[in-house]
C-alpha cells in the first residue's frame, strides 16, 4: 500500500513483488517506508528501494519495530555493512528509525501505530494515518 501524503509517497511494507507493483501503478518515487511486521511477504522487496536514494539525495527512511529491523539486517546484511559498492546503486541505502506504539511523524503527517496480533501471539502493527487505518495480517482489532 502506498499513500500520497503532502510531503511524499509513504509505502507500507515491501513485498517480494514490490518492483512489479510500483511499475504497474506508475509510482516513480517512494519517500519513506513503514513496516507492519517481519514476515517475508512484507519485507523481501526491500532491495528494490535502492533506486530511490538517487532521486531523494539521501538514504530511504524506514520506520519499524526492533524485531523487524533485526530481520531486515539479517536478510539484507549487505545493505547495513560498510561493503564497497560494485557499481552505483548496487546497495540500498536505508535510514533506520525505530518505532513503538507511540505516535510519530513521517513526511509531515502524524502516524498512530496500532498493536495487533497475527494469530494468538505474533505482534504486528497497524497504522492510523489521517482518516485511513491500515491493518494487515490480523485476526482481531482492539476496541480503542
Where are these regions (language model features)?
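Binuclear metal-dependent hydrolase catalytic cores
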Residues: 1-135, 139-143
Amino acid at each position: 500500500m502506498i499513500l500520497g501524503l503532502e510531503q511524499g509517497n509513504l509505502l507500507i511494507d515491501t513485498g517480494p513483488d514490490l518492483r512489479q507493483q510500483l511499475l504497474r501503478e506508475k509510482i516513480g518515487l517512494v519517500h519513506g517506508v513503514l513496516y507492519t511486521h517481519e514476515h517475508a511477504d512484507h519485507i523481501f522487496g526491500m532491495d528494490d528501494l535502492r533506486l530511490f536514494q538517487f532521486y531523494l539525495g539521501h538514504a530511504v527512511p524506514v520506520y519499524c519495530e526492533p524485531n523487524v529491523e533485526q530481520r531486515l539486517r539479517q536478510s539484507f546484511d549487505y545493505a547495513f555493512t560498510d561493503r564497497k559498492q560494485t557499481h552505483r546503486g548496487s546497495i540500498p541505502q536505508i535510514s533506520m528509525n525505530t518505532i513503538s506504539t507511540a505516535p510519530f511523524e513521517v513526511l509531515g503527517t502524524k502516524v498512530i501505530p496500532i498493536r495487533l496480533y497475527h494469530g494468538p501471539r505474533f505482534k504486528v502493527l497497524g497504522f492510523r494515518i489521517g482518516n485511513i487505518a491500515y491493518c494487515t495480517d490480523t485476526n482481531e482489532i482492539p476496541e480503542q
